[in-house]
């Protein structure tokens, strides 16, 4: 009986409870923030305008970087083409034997110190790792010489113990043969090898570069191969004049061949870097232009919607005043 009375009283009180006004709760936001939340269109317009300004600044930077890369490419390209005449006679004389089987191989990986140049650095790293797998074995040793900050950063992750020498900031100053020959001399003094395999990007055009491997054999391997015969067997047909022995002559030829091949490889890789950076910056500039067009369209639509809303509010207010009269 008591429960029935309680239920009746509850039903009688329920409408009055539901109709009670909800107490006002002060917002934790400041007046400016509340104003901003209510004015969504004005905020979105400002955000789009700021975004457009950022994209314009980025587009200016990418265009400037493209022009700088084009200027550097013109300066290096002619020297790279001229340097091809240095190593070609040595390749004709001593050969280029990428498939030769030796016990000690050293892979010289050439990369850039700076980024924003497409996939030239990842490409030479992939080729270097493939050479490591091909030449590694139970009685074989493969080591790395890294030239450039980008390849160094990638190779240090999983091949740190196999890196015997790393060189950075080679392109800080204009490249010349004396600078590269000092680098080649350091490699020859600090690294024991039977074959040096130089991995670099050969320049073809602004949008095309070819990963290339050039092989330089040690004097001992050259002499051994010349005794066996084949292409290197033709070395015995040359008459040696002066007091130098065949081993000393081969030593000098191998060292000079390595420095010439390195000089050409460094210049070819520098051309590929500048060409790839030109292409990347041109693509970035075009993408920024397309993004700017979309943002301009969004800004105009948002602004038009805001103006339309304000006009509707003005007309509605005027109509209400007319009706009140």
UniProtKB/Swiss-Prot annotation:
Organism: Arabidopsis thaliana
Origin superkingdom: Eukaryota
One MF term in the entry's GO annotations: zinc ion binding
Known role: Mitochondrial membrane ATP synthase (F(1)F(0) ATP synthase or Complex V) produces ATP from ADP in the presence of a proton gradient across the membrane which is generated by electron transport complexes of the respiratory chain. F-type ATPases consist of two structural domains, F(1) - containing the extramembraneous catalytic core, and F(0) - containing the membrane proton channel, linked together by a central stalk and a peripheral stalk. During catalysis, ATP synthesis in the catalytic domain of F(1) is coupled via a rotary mechanism of the central stalk subunits to proton translocation.
Family under the similarity heading: Belongs to the ATPase gamma chain family.
Pfam families for this protein: ATP-synt
Transit peptide segment: 1-42
Subunit structure, as described in the record: F-type ATPases have 2 components, CF(1) - the catalytic core - and CF(0) - the membrane proton channel. CF(1) has five subunits: alpha(3), beta(3), gamma(1), delta(1), epsilon(1). CF(0) has three main subunits: a, b and c.
Protein name (Swiss-Prot/TrEMBL): ATP synthase subunit gamma, mitochondrial
UniProtKB keywords: ATP synthesis, CF(1), Hydrogen ion transport, Ion transport, Membrane, Mitochondrion, Mitochondrion inner membrane, Transit peptide, Transport
């Amino acid at each position: 009986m008591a429960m029935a009375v309680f239920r009746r009283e509850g039903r009688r009180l329920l409408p009055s409870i539901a109709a009670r006004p909800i107490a006002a709760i002060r917002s934790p936001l400041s007046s400016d923030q509340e104003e901003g939340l209510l004015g969504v269109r004005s905020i979105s317009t400002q955000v789009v305008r700021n975004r457009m300004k950022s994209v314009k600044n980025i587009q200016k930077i990418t265009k400037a970087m493209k022009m700088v890369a084009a200027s550097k490419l013109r300066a290096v390209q002619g020297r790279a083409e001229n340097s091809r005449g240095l190593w070609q006679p040595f390749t004709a004389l001593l050969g280029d034997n990428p498939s030769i089987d030796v016990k000690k191989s050293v892979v010289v990986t050439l990369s850039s110190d700076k980024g924003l140049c497409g996939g030239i650095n990842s490409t030479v790293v992939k080729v270097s790792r493939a050479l490591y797998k091909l030449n590694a074995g139970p009685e074989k040793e493969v080591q790395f010489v890294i030239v450039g900050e980008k390849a160094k950063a990638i190779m240090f992750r999983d091949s740190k113990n196999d890196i015997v020498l790393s060189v950075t900031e080679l392109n800080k100053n204009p490249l010349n043969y004396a600078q590269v020959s000092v680098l080649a001399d350091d490699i020859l003094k600090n690294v024991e090898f039977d074959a040096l395999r130089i991995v670099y990007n050969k320049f073809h055009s602004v949008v095309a570069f070819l990963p290339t491997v050039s092989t330089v054999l040690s004097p001992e391997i050259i002499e051994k191969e010349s005794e066996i015969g084949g292409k290197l067997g033709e070395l015995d047909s040359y008459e040696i004049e002066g007091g130098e022995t065949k081993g000393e002559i081969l030593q000098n030829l191998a060292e000079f061949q390595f420095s010439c091949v390195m000089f050409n490889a460094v210049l070819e890789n520098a051309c590929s870097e500048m060409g790839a950076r030109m292409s990347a910056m041109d693509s970035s500039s075009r993408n920024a232009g397309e993004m700017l067009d979309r943002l301009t369209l969004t800004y105009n639509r948002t602004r038009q919607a805001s103006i339309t809303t304000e006009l509707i509010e003005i007309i509605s207010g005027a109509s209400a005043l007319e009706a009140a009269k």
